[in-house]
Amino acid sequence: MNKELQPKVIFLMGPTASGKTALALELAEKHNCEIISVDSALIYRGMDIGSAKPSADELARGPHRLIDIRDPSESYSAADFRADAITEIEQIISMGKTPVLVGGTMMYFKALLEGLSPLPSADEAIRAEIQAEADEKGWEALHDQLREIDPVSAERIHPNDPQRLSRALEVYRISGKSMTELTQTKSAPLPYDVVQFAIAPRERKVLHDLIAQRFAIMLKQGFLEEVTELKARGDLHLDLPSMRCVGYRQCWQYLDGEFDYDTMVEKAVAATRQLAKRQLTWLRSWPELNWLESGAEGNLVTLMRQCR
């Protein structure tokens, strides 16, 4: 179908603390748009302060889809996101509105835009079998196995990365095909006219300062108390994807007595800055991207002009 005849979908990407939410809310209020969150932390219930989840007032102004859809004990993959996001996009378009996908989880945006390889679902029995082999022989021996069946993945995956190494072996044992073979086939790309924007401060120091300021505000809002409540549940631990979110891990470790308060703040801010750096690295290599400067006047006008 000609792109001009396809329904329009807006991507608004950017590093953490860059002002994505404020611009998305303006879009929702003034231009018949609905917001879909693209954030691997906002999906979790009870993780509100440390994830910078939109406030009740902001959600009243512009409801966000795909937030608070999982318990922190649960996992959520890029494939899960793609399926859920496509459902939400189709609903919004059927209402005569424009979907605006807003967030900083670049892997989700990439999966949505380009499609995903048809990898098999996890098999707990096979995972346990691989773990038992690793306990007996060591991960180096399993890495040698991977090199024999999938040298391309073995080159990419380090022997000290058991999670990815285990997954590559699991995929082969389930399907009889290597990860490399399977990833050569992808699901269909999005059948929409996708207009893509990135928003970020021009100067890195500005972003670094915003990150430090925002973490200080989170602590005043009760971030440590939020993590204390999550710890008290008893079913969560630091190996879960939810607890690997920046800020949560460092607060958890502080509450465990691993380091003092000032060190916790320093580590959390540093981890958030590293996340922002990775996000910007993704974005700089992203094709067909329109850049906006955080806080600049006229961003909404510029965005709407590009969408025509």
Swiss-Prot record:
Enzyme Commission number, as recorded: 2.5.1.75
Site (Interaction with substrate tRNA): 105, 127
Enzyme class, first EC level, given as a word: transferase
Residues annotated for ATP binding in this entry: 14-21
Reactions catalysed, as given in the entry: adenosine(37) in tRNA + dimethylallyl diphosphate = N(6)-dimethylallyladenosine(37) in tRNA + diphosphate
Source superkingdom: Bacteria
Amino acids binding substrate: 16-21
Listed PANTHER family: TRNA DIMETHYLALLYLTRANSFERASE
Job description of the protein: Catalyzes the transfer of a dimethylallyl group onto the adenine at position 37 in tRNAs that read codons beginning with uridine, leading to the formation of N6-(dimethylallyl)adenosine (i(6)A).
Protein known as: tRNA dimethylallyltransferase
Originating species: Shewanella baltica (strain OS185)
